[in-house]
């Protein structure tokens, strides 16, 4: 098999910018290059439910150019940018067929991103980071200052969200010594506000518009727009954070303090702060505001909250995913799967029942990810779509 493109994504929702990344990457490597995507499941890295289910988003991806969509298991979907990238890139590497990793960035150039990634991997960076943190500035600012000591103004790249992920992807490639060739495509028209021009908007703006009841189909590929319209008609979406508030609060209030202290990111008393907030505040926003500290971003607290509710602990998101679950198969997906089956270093799951026989931690993580779907569907607008156990019954979508 020749070149195979790997892409890490959330597709929350799949939009024109995502289709453009696939198109631009194929323009560089060849129009018939197969594309395999590792995609977050029902909960995403910002610590929120996805607006549409993983099954709908995976179907949209293969109808819009991808050939195979694999699920990033829950512990890595709800991890920091570093953990998210490590898990997703590691999963692509474990397939044994992916030759290139393509990602969008505000920078659009590989060399500056590589220099920042190398600076972050400097063993002495931790000492400089701790020195910056002692001055009382937030973690992100302290990290940027520590990197600036090594690469100067290039550290400013860490102020843009897609640059941050791009750097983490590169770190994952270097740290795991993977034979993946990185490619980056300039993000266009994807500013994180309402004033972007053209037919591309950022996913964050589209989620905001969807939450407000607006029609966003002009910014989605036609096939994706049709899929999400179908999901809305059937009452399976959109799933908005407020729809899960009562379920999340009830879960958070039932957990002992020991669970909070075992959460990913529960350092410097954050676990204790979140435990107190969960037992004092009447709303989820109140919990987040009460637990937030000056040093850490709100997204970190949201992830901790979701990890607590879903049973993710700090022992789960180390390393890389121990299996590859197939969510959707596109035009070249069958051929790609045959090659992966011969070369992958992890089990490839096409039928969810096979997840029950995964040994040890792999089976536990598969079951945890399936349980998360049961919480997710409680946010579906239609009551009949809130049935339990759906993740165990779902087969991959086949184009």
Language model region names:
Residues 50-54, 62, 81, 85:
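Generic structural signal for well-ordered secondary structure
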Residues 1-57:
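N-terminal catalytic cores of NTP/NDP-binding nucleotidyl/phosphoryl-transfer enzymes
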Residues 26-30, 62, 92-93, 174:
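N-terminal cationic-hydrophobic initiation segments that often serve targeting/anchoring roles
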């Amino acid at each position: 098999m020749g070149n195979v493109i790997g892409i890490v994504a959330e597709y929350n929702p799949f939009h024109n910018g995502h289709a453009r990344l696939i198109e631009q990457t194929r323009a560089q490597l060849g129009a018939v290059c197969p594309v395999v995507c590792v995609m977050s499941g029902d909960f995403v890295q910002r610590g929120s439910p996805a607006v549409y289910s993983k099954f709908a988003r995976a179907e949209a991806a293969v109808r819009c150019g991808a050939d195979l969509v694999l699920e990033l298991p829950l512990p890595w979907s709800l991890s920091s940018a570093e953990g998210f990238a490590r898990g997703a890139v590691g999963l692509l590497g474990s397939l044994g067929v992916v030759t290139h990793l393509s990602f969008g960035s505000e920078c659009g150039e590989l060399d500056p991103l590589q220099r920042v990634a190398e600076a972050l991997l400097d063993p002495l960076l931790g000492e400089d980071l701790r020195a910056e943190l002692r001055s009382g500035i937030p973690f992100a600012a302290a990290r940027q200052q520590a990197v600036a000591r090594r690469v100067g103004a290039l550290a400013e790249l860490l102020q843009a969200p897609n640059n941050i992920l791009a750097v983490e992807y590169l770190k994952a490639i270097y740290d795991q010594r993977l034979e993946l060739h990185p490619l980056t495509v300039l993000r266009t028209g994807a500013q994180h506000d309402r004033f972007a021009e053209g037919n591309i908007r950022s996913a964050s703006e589209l989620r905001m518009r969807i939450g407000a009841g607006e029609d966003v189909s002009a910014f989605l590929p036609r096939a994706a727009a049709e899929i999400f319209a179908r999901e809305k008609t059937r009452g399976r979406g959109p799933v908005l954070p407020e729809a899960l508030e009562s379920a999340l609060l009830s879960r958070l209030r039932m957990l002992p303090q020991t669970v909070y202290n075992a959460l990913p990111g529960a350092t410097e008393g954050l676990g204790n702060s979140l435990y107190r907030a969960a037992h004092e505040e009447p709303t989820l926003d109140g919990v987040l505001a009460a637990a937030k500290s000056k040093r850490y971003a709100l997204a970190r607290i949201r992830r901790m909250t979701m990890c607590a509710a879903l049973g993710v602990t700090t022992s789960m998101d180390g390393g890389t995913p121990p299996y590859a679950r197939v969510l959707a198969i596109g035009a070249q997906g069958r051929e790609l799967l045959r090659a992966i089956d011969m070369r992958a270093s992890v089990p490839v799951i096409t039928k969810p029942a096979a997840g029950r026989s995964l040994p040890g931690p792999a089976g536990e993580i598969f079951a945890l990810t399936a349980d998360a779907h049961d919480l997710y569907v409680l946010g579906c607008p239609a009551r009949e779509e809130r049935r339990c156990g759906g993740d165990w019954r779902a087969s991959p979508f086949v184009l």
